[in-house]
């Protein structure tokens, strides 16, 4: 059964059409990624779902208009707010369930920092705290807007792993936007923004050079190198890992 329904969504900004008759259906508990270039409308799309912008069309979550439940839709951005409160103080504003707080802090490796002021946290820890706060609010929908741009691969993997863990445990519905191909690995499905539309795309089609090139998507170095080596017939199509690539080149 569809949980998020978007029908004939259109939006313009200063007479410039950003989206035209977009239709999407997302199931409860799905983690979807929206992949496209910068300045393509990813952030605008999430702001529309959050109910922060006026639009033409219909957006419902759990059969309710977003104007009714927008306070129960969590939008995570790269912007981090710092207060003089400690991590524990921040979380106690959301719930008094100390057992739940303790568990999630341990999962995100923040338990030892519980009495630390949020002003002293790194960007990485601030983002972990924001995700924790979002999860504790038990939202109808979580929107994540390219928050991993300033994180290294280890930090990204840690956060993605925890988000996926709680998505599966709590049946969370998540929409994530990114320009990086490597960031979609935890997704249940992937969409592309192109020509004012948002379209579901298969993994097979996604990894074609044309789609990547047309949408100015940042690809992992492995795939970029693979395409160049294939161009000179140095490796075959079925190479999928670095070790296989090295073996074929050395033959």
Where are these regions (language model features)?
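Conserved catalytic motifs of ABC-family nucleotide-binding domains
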Residues: 74, 79-89, 93, 117
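Conserved ABC nucleotide-binding domain
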Residues: 104-121
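The feature captures the beta-strand-to-loop junction immediately N-terminal to the Walker
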Residues: 35-37
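Conserved structural motif at the start of ABC-family nucleotide-binding domains
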Residues: 4, 18-21
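Conserved ABC transporter NBD signature motif
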Residues: 57-70
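Conserved beta-strand-loop-alpha-helix hinge in the C-terminal portion
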Residues: 197-222
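Helix-to-loop junction immediately C-terminal to a conserved catalytic motif
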Residues: 50
């Amino acid at each position: 059964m569809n949980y998020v329904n978007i029908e004939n969504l259109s939006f313009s900004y200063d007479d410039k059409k950003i989206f035209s008759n977009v239709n999407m259906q997302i199931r409860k508990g799905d983690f979807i990624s929206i992949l496209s270039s910068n300045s393509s409308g990813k952030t605008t799309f999430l702001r529309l779902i959050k109910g922060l912008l006026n639009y033409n069309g219909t957006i419902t979550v759990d059969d309710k208009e977003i104007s009714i439940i927008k306070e129960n839709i969590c939008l995570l951005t790269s912007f981090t707010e710092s207060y003089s409160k400690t991590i524990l103080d921040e979380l106690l504003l959301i719930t008094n369930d100390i057992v739940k707080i303790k568990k999630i802090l341990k999962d995100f490796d923040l338990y030892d920092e519980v009495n630390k002021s949020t002003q002293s946290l790194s960007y990485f820890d601030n983002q972990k705290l924001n995700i924790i706060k979002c999860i504790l609010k038990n939202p109808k929908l979580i929107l994540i807007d390219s928050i991993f741009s300033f994180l290294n691969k280890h930090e990204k993997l840690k956060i993605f792993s925890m988000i996926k863990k709680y998505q599966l445990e709590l049946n969370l519905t998540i929409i994530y936007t990114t320009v990086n191909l490597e960031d979609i690995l935890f997704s249940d499905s992937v969409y592309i923004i192109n020509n004012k539309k948002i379209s579901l795309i298969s993994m097979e089609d996604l990894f074609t050079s044309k789609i990547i090139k047309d949408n100015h998507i940042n690809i992992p170095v492995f795939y970029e190198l693979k395409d160049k080596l294939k161009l000179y017939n140095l490796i075959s199509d079925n190479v999928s890992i670095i070790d296989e690539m090295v073996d074929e080149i050395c033959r």
